[in-house]
Every structure is written in C-alpha cells, then in structure tokens.
Amino acid sequence: MSPRVGVTLSGRYRLQRLIATGGMGQVWEAVDNRLGRRVAVKVLKSEFSSDPEFIERFRAEARTTAMLNHPGIASVHDYGESQMNGEGRTAYLVMELVNGEPLNSVLKRTGRLSLRHALDMLEQTGRALQIAHAAGLVHRDVKPGNILITPTGQVKITDFGIAKAVDAAPVTQTGMVMGTAQYIAPEQALGHDASPASDVYSLGVVGYEAVSGKRPFAGDGALTVAMKHIKEPPPPLPPDLPPNVRELIEITLVKNPAMRYRSGGPFADAVAAVRAGRRPPRPSQTPPPGRAAPAAIPSGTTARVAANSAGRTAASRRSRPATGGHRPPRRTFSSGQRALLWAAGVLGALAIIIAVLLVIKAPGDNSPQQAPTPTVTTTGNPPASNTGGTDASPRLNWTERGETRHSGLQSWVVPPTPHSRASLARYEIAQ
C-alpha cells in the first residue's frame, strides 16, 4: 500500500495531506498521534525502497540533519521504517512543519527584496550555515527554494538531503555533480568536492538575485548555465546599489574558492559590517585547520599552464643540491606525441562537460524538486571560534498588515492559519 491519506506510519504518524513530491520521496502533512502535533513526513518513494543506494542516502539524510540544532535550520523530529502491507519497508523522516514561504516564491511575487531585508536574510542564512560548517557538513544546494521565511522574519534553511559530511565516505557516485545549475559553485560544476566556500558562493548567487531581481547567469539549459559559472565573471550589479553591497557580492562570486569567505560565519560577519555601513572585510585565505587550501579553478589557458610549470621548475631547482654543472637532457616530444597529448586533453575536457550535462539539475528554481529537508539535534554547541562571530545585527520583522498571496509554495511550507496573529509579509520591493 502506497502512502495515502489516512495511512498511519509505525502506528504513530497519520498522513493527512500530500504537500509535495520531490526527487527522492513525497512530503506529507501528518499528525503525530502520540504528541498531538502537526508534523511533516517525508516518505521515500516506493520505487526506491528496494534500492540500497537510495535507502542509504535517505538514512544519511536523517543522520546529517540530526546533528544540527539552530533556529535557522528546520528541525527533524524522528526517523523510521514502516511496513507497507507486503510491499516491503518504507523509510521516512518526521520534520518540523514550517509556517513560512520559500524565498523563490517571494522573489517571484516581488521581483527583488529591499536592501535591508536582503541583507537581513543573507546574514541569518550565513549564521545558520555556519552551524553545519562547524560540524563538518556542506549543504551543497543552497538556493531560494531551500530558504524559508516565517511571518516574523526568521530564516530557516531546509533540504540537507544532499549534504554530506566532509570527512565521511561519499554516498554519491565518484565525480557526481550535486546542486542546482543556477546556483552551483564552479568547483561543484567541475565535479570537485564541495566545501563550505561552495555554500558561500551559492548564497552569493542568492544575494545577487535578491538585490538585483535577476540571476547572474542565464542560458538555454543547465550545461550552458553551469559553464558560465565556471568561466564567466558575473555581470555588474545595478549602479544604484551601495558600493559596499556590490563589493560583498563580488567577493562571494569569485571563481577560486580560496579567495571567498571560507564558511558561513565569516560571510555573515561581512554582511553585518555592510549593514553597519562599513566595507566588507577581505576574506582570510588561511585554509581551515587540517585542510589544504582549495585549488583555483583551472582556466585551460596555455599561459596559466606554462606559468604553473615554470613555478614548479624554479622551486625544484632551488631545492636540489648543486650537481657540478651537469644538467639532464631536456625532454622533447615528437609531433605525433604532442598530437596525442593534445587529443587526451580535449577528451578529458569533453568528459567533464558530459558528466555535468548528465547529472546536473534543471537550471530553474521553480521546477518540481525534492522536498526540503529540515534539520535538528546537535550534540553540543560548536566552539565559539567556529560560530563566525555573534549575531549583533537585529533581525527585522518582515510582517506587514494586509493579505498576502501564497502562490508557488513548495515542500512542506504552509501558509498561516486563520488563527495566525500575523500574515506573511508582503515584502517591499527595492526601488
């Protein structure tokens, strides 16, 4: 028996309404019979229940979200597996039912946010991401559809479903690209490991869209957009924006992850500085303890390769002892060998492009997608040095009087009930 209205999972969670269908499962509004509260239940799709890889990914999602506890991260309450009348066991997550609206729906309705609301959203999101980054987790799919805003202006990040612990064995296939093309970091589009700086890049794209009303890169398909993230600089932001705001977004959208803010905390601190009227601080280029600095995105140009080769040769010469003037013969290649090397390089580049095309998601953020996965329970607070500073900037109350249209709500996000004291904000469009 497939999930349907009235089904009770594990004798406790009674499904009441289908909210959304995503890549891995369905999200239902349900009632917890034991505690008498409304919850969201994400049920793994039946066609994936017999697939060990999908089952493991679903379990990993539960473990990931169970590590985190922060007001800015939607909560997970429970995980379980339930027998479905002879169809085998089906896994599910029980999550916080968020009373809010996804940012992509807000932007669709308003065009862009006022500057003060955009900066408030970015700082809150950065501080919430820092909790995950301090725990060794990378979200890998930061986008407006995964950023919810409650009637009081509280930001909640959802859908850590493709997040993975940086130090854990990957569940996804080697080289698999995870993320959404419009918001993907260049290193992710190339199939490299995602880092906290990758989340910062994606959040920078969100910020670009929030303050300008458009995404930095557009194209006919996911591959085109992803290649622009890899190779092209973002178009200049509108000149009516303050210089420090433009500088903040420009820093987060550099191609080299080592040149960005290294995690959500330093980014949030930079946003706080901008909100206070100061210039954003330059990112620290010191890599996190125990990790090598990420490599720059390769440009594929002969000049870059030649410069790197020359630098390595010079360093090698300095480190070798004198050999009495004897120099080994210089290695040369025949024209046939050079042709083979050139062909191998072209084939390698084509392989990367094909991999991106096969696995990257659709370019838009409004198409049906996997339901966001809220997150919860941390085993203690991270050290103060990992929090990225204190949240000194006051959170704005985004609530205004009057009705708010709720179009395009996604995941398990629900509009306020008639008993809500405040309706969702009709966000001010920046002039």
From Swiss-Prot:
Protein task: Protein kinase that regulates many aspects of mycobacterial physiology, and is critical for growth in vitro and survival of the pathogen in the host. Is a key component of a signal transduction pathway that regulates cell growth, cell shape and cell division via phosphorylation of target proteins such as FtsZ, Wag31, GlmU, PstP, EmbR and Rv1422.
GO cellular component, one term: plasma membrane
CDD domains reported for this sequence: STKc_PknB_like
Organism from which the protein derives: Mycobacterium tuberculosis (strain ATCC 25618 / H37Rv)
Record-given protein name: Serine/threonine-protein kinase PknA
Membrane topology: Single-pass membrane protein
Pfam families: Pkinase (PF00069)
Residues given in the record as ATP binding sites: I19, A20, T21, G22, G23, M24, G25, Q26, V27, K42
